[in-house]
Amino acid sequence: MPPYTVVYFPVRGRCAALRMLLADQGQSWKEEVVTMETWQEGSLKASCLYGQLPKFQDGDLTLYQSNTFLRHLGRTLGLYGKDQREAALVDMVNDGVEDLRCKYLSLIYTNYEAGKDDYVKALPGQLKPFETLLSQNQGGKTFIVGDQISFADYNLLDLLLIHEVLAPGCLDAFPLLSAYVARLSARPKLKAFLASPEHVNLPINGNGKQ
């Protein structure tokens, strides 16, 4: 039985980066899909620490909060930089990803029709820091931090992919980010996962937007 279990709704949502990481690292995991009917019944929600999903199980360790999953696997699988300096930079990148993801989710779930145009107009300013970070690391030819992949790379990749769906061409002005997405997406195990029905057939969000 796989040591890892993902408990979540039938969406990519806040587990897409986690699944990318697991797939790319050659890990197996079990999915426990929660329907809205089951969730609205209430007993599962009441059992969750913060009253929300996703939930992640690593053996007898139960975790909540999607970024906690990534950091845990970063430590477990050696995806947290090669030293404390790189680990600090990985944390900084991941926090920046979370900031933009929260803005994206606010748009998707609360203001999509009225707010999309303004969001897309402001998007270059939100993406520029990641282009800058790439430019400062070996000319943008490797990863977002250092010379080995980290959990922040998977989170950033997912963020960029969903924004390419929201605003096609949004990376055209960012050559390093564009090349980064292409390079990471071409990693054999990750490429196979991104093309798999398990990924492709899931909506990005739970409300029909994207």
Swiss-Prot record:
Modified residues (N6-acetyllysine): K128
Locations listed in the record: Cytoplasm; Mitochondrion; Nucleus
Modified residue annotations for Phosphotyrosine: Y4
Keywords: Acetylation, Cytoplasm, Lipid metabolism, Mitochondrion, Nucleus, Phosphoprotein, Transferase
Gene Ontology terms, MF aspect: glutathione transferase activity
Modified residues (Phosphothreonine): T62
PROSITE patterns per the UniProt record, alphabetical: GST_CTER, GST_NTER
GST N-terminal domain span: 2-81
Keyword Signal listed: no
Major enzyme class: transferase
Modified residues (N6-succinyllysine): K103, K116
Record-level GO BP terms: glutathione derivative biosynthetic process; glutathione metabolic process; hepoxilin biosynthetic process; prostaglandin metabolic process; xenobiotic metabolic process
InterPro entries in the cross-refs: Glutathione-S-Trfase_C-like, Glutathione-S-Trfase_C_sf, Glutathione_S-Trfase, Glutathione_S-Trfase_N, GST_C, GST_pi, GST_superfamily, Thioredoxin-like_sf
Positions annotated to bind glutathione: Y8, R14, W39, K45, Q52, L53, Q65, S66
Chief place of localization: cytoplasm
GO terms under cellular component: cytosol; mitochondrion; nucleus
Residues of the GST C-terminal domain: 83-204
Catalytic function, reaction form: RX + glutathione = an S-substituted glutathione + a halide anion + H(+); prostaglandin J2 + glutathione = prostaglandin J2-S-(R)-glutathione; prostaglandin J2 + glutathione = prostaglandin J2-S-(S)-glutathione; prostaglandin A2 + glutathione = prostaglandin A2-S-(S)-glutathione
This protein's record includes keyword Iron-sulfur: no
Superkingdom assignment: Eukaryota
Enzyme Commission number(s) from the entry: 2.5.1.18
Gene3D superfamilies: 1.20.1050.10, Glutaredoxin
Family: Belongs to the GST superfamily. Pi family.
Subunit-structure text: Homodimer. Interacts with CDK5.
Protein task: Conjugation of reduced glutathione to a wide number of exogenous and endogenous hydrophobic electrophiles. Involved in the formation of glutathione conjugates of both prostaglandin A2 (PGA2) and prostaglandin J2 (PGJ2). Participates in the formation of novel hepoxilin regioisomers. Negatively regulates CDK5 activity via p25/p35 translocation to prevent neurodegeneration.
Protein name: Glutathione S-transferase P
Protein source organism: Macaca mulatta (Rhesus macaque)
